[in-house]
Amino acid sequence: MGEDAAQAEKFQHPNTDMLQEKPSSPSPMPSSTPSPSLNLGSTEEAIRDNSQVNAVTVHTLLDKLVNMLDAVRENQHNMEQRQINLEGSVKGIQNDLTKLSKYQASTSNTVSKLLEKSRKVSAHTRAVRERLERQCVQVKRLENNHAQLLRRNHFKVLIFQEESEIPASVFVKEPVPSAAEGKEELADENKSLEETLHNVDLSSDDELPRDEEALEDSAEEKMEESRAEKIKRSSLKKVDSLKKAFSRQNIEKKMNKLGTKIVSVERREKIKKSLTPNHQKASSGKSSPFKVSPLSFGRKKVREGESSVENETKLEDQMQEDREEGSFTEGLSEASLPSGLMEGSAEDAEKSARRGNNSAVGSNADLTIEEDEEEEPVALQQAQQVRYESGYMLNSEEMEEPSEKQVQPAVLHVDQTA
């Protein structure tokens, strides 16, 4: 662009120079006297020449401008292509970077997995090392024991054979009475075991001669006999133990123990005394000749704050309590005493029941009414004794005949008011 402007200036400068030169030329002419027609023609020619030159210069300048614009357009087109190429290369670089990031993530995952596996392998290697160290220690111990056995010449090899087993006499055990004897017996058993182990043949069956085969047959027969004897002894011992366990004495002892646990000895003696027919309770001198009487009459004065109805209810409550105590003692006696004693008690109860029935028939005739105030405690004692004995007899009758109804003694109170 700068060069084109300089060239345009050059084209303009010569035209201006020509114009300057042309007007200077007529300056000397005034000395001469030219004609005015000639002067007009020369000026017109000069103007035409200047116009032609200006048109040419403008045309050339326009051509140059067109060329310059074409060049600029080409340069811009090239720049656009280069920019497009740069954008494609940048996109390719971005794709490569994304691929690299993906590869890096996958490699990081694989590296983490490898690290975990390496840790596990290291843990396994440590465990293996520990096991190997333990095995080395055990091997060293075995080597030491082996060396000691070889030095002592006590190296033994035991081969299990179904036909030739260890004799049963070695395994027979007797009861140990004391600690010292037990130690001696253990030492003897160990010696016998060692002897039998030494006697075991280690050679194969092919190398044995016929005489040794005969000896083995005899040994097998002896072993079978010893086994049969063992089985017989064990069975006899078991039978004896069962007989002892289920003997009558052991059962009686166990029953007595259970009875003592349920009922104490003192209580049992009291129950026995109460069941014996010859046993008689102490009674007052003024009592009736018959022990059991279903009817009894007593007299009491009515004191202050008490009524006849309250006295009757109290006496009935006492009668019920006595009956409950009698039935409870009889139940305990049946649970604690053995079968033989229970049979005897049942017979005694039958006898006493019969006596009670007989006495009940005759006691209806003897009814005493005491009216003296001084004999009131004696009458109370008699009434309590009659209640106790009648309750006992009724309980015995209930044991023999549960279907019969209980006969309650009728207590009749005669209250006198002064």
UniProtKB/Swiss-Prot annotation:
Disruption phenotype: Mice show loss of endothelial caveolae in lung and adipose tissue but no effect on the abundance of endothelial caveolae in the heart. Residues 62-100 are annotated as: Leucine-zipper. InterPro entries: Cavin_fam. Residues 2-168 are annotated as: Interaction with CAVIN1. Keywords: Acetylation, Coiled coil, Cytoplasm, Lipid-binding, Membrane, Phosphoprotein. Its main location: cytoplasm. Plays an important role in caveolar biogenesis and morphology. Regulates caveolae morphology by inducing membrane curvature within caveolae. Plays a role in caveola formation in a tissue-specific manner. Required for the formation of caveolae in the lung and fat endothelia but not in the heart endothelia. Negatively regulates the size or stability of CAVIN complexes in the lung endothelial cells. May play a role in targeting PRKCA to caveolae. This is Caveolae-associated protein 2. It comes from the Eukaryota. Heart, adipose tissue, lung and endothelial cells (at protein level). Highly expressed in kidney and expressed at lower levels in liver, spleen, thymus, stomach, intestine and uterus. The modification Phosphoserine is found at residues 27, 35, 37, 51, 203-204, 218, 283-284, 287-288, 293, 296, 327, 336, 359, 363, 390, 396. Residues 275-287, 355-366 have a biased composition (Polar residues). Residues 203-219, 368-377 have a biased composition (Acidic residues). Disulfide bonds: none annotated. The modification Phosphothreonine is found at residues 196, 368. Component of the CAVIN complex composed of CAVIN1, CAVIN2, CAVIN3 and CAVIN4. Binds to PRKCA in the presence of phosphatidylserine. Interacts with CAVIN4; this augments the transactivation of NPPA by CAVIN4. Interacts with CAVIN1. Interacts with CAV3. It holds the Pfam family PTRF_SDPR. Residues 1-42, 200-238, 262-382, 396-418 are annotated as: Disordered. Binds phosphatidylserine (PS) in a calcium-independent manner. PS-binding is inhibited by phosphotidic acid and phosphatidylinositol. Does not bind phosphatidylcholine. One of its GO terms (cellular component) is cytosol. Residues 220-238, 303-321 have a biased composition (Basic and acidic residues). One of its GO terms (biological process) is positive regulation of transcription by RNA polymerase II. The N-terminus is blocked. Induction: Up-regulated in response to cardiac hypertrophy and in serum-starved but not in density-dependent growth-arrested NIH3T3 cells. Down-regulated within 6 hours after the addition of serum or epidermal growth factor to serum-starved cells. Residues 61-87, 126-268 form a coiled coil. The gene is Cavin2.
